């Protein structure tokens, strides 16, 4: 394990605000308790796995069984900030263009937009209440060079990717978002929105199950063997047998799961706090104007959005340990950062604090594909913090691949890079600790 055992303890709930918006006791999918055979086994019952199961069953009549290690929504699907947005590659625009060229970079951005649209489409088609908010995403620049980057992003997104975008001056920010004397400006991108991720995930599960997919939570894969053309996935309660496997475990992928997948991913802790509901007078005191999700163009990322009941959700990078003491330090640090950023809310109570794992890859790109050594094994993960939309799109794409409706070569090149091992993988988190320590020392977040 790269982090403290508490990060992986599936008997502990996240303690998130989202958990208070649903009745978790009503989620009654059983664990696997006997041997089963199915067409497709899906390891991971988050957004990617559920989207794959739904599309396999509904669109292609293919039976699948999902093995989820914890309770439904225990992982990132129930812990994220509910940003249905683009940005699944950690490579910036210039690096994407240099590596993949304009045509493939455009295809990547088109796929990202399709992902956000697919979430809304599924919510409408399957009657999923997702508590959608906002009509885009706002990126704020705090330095002159970052503002110039946003201007270049605007030129590319509008002229090449065909995104609806606007550049906002500090005056525009004051009138449409909130007064921010330090900001150089912002980029508004009109393809994103906010939602309640736990409601969305449970809605996907209900829809997938109603269309014929079987869902088995509390059923971690203890061993994975191959017998001829059959994959044998052993859990504590029984064995699942399938000729095709989809791995959709993202930041919670265990290195031991499959030798061709181990040491290829880097889970990163991300932390979130929420305030009590803010009154209309408190919102007015801060000059707050929007429900559209916001993130900042900092070395240290801050992201935030106003929720349906008036709470402010405020997120940032997590720690590098994940133990109780560090979590409390992160909560205090984030509460202080929130108060410094929004002085009118400096003394507002923090009601919820939690963290979860974001997934990065060695290539800094998302990955959707199949193993060259065993083409009956498919995978989708490494969304770099944009898993709501990209996980949904990846799940549909994986279903299309399994059903033979598309080929790997048809995917945007950004998604089909070969999986690469991290050098000295046991030191992955130590690299991260050194990077964060240097960043804090040099105060690069300013």
Language model features: what each stretch is:
Residues 2-15, 21, 90-97, 120-203:
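Flavin (FAD/FMN) cofactor-binding and adjacent substrate-gating region
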Residues 1-40, 58-59:
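Extreme N-terminal leader/targeting segments of oxidoreductases
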Residues 38-66:
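N-terminal Rossmann-like FAD-binding beta1-loop-alpha1 element of flavoenzymes
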Residues 363-366, 370-373, 378, 408-446:
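Helix-rich C-terminal "cap"/substrate-channel and partner-interaction subdomain
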Residues 156-158, 183-243:
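Helical element adjacent to the flavin cofactor pocket in flavoenzyme catalytic cores
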Residues 82, 117, 125-133, 221-223, ...:
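Active-site substrate-recognition segment that forms the wall
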Residues 80-110:
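Glycine-rich active-site loop/strand segments that organize a redox cofactor
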Residues 391-411:
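Internal hydrophobic alpha-helix adjacent to the cofactor/substrate pocket in enzyme cavities
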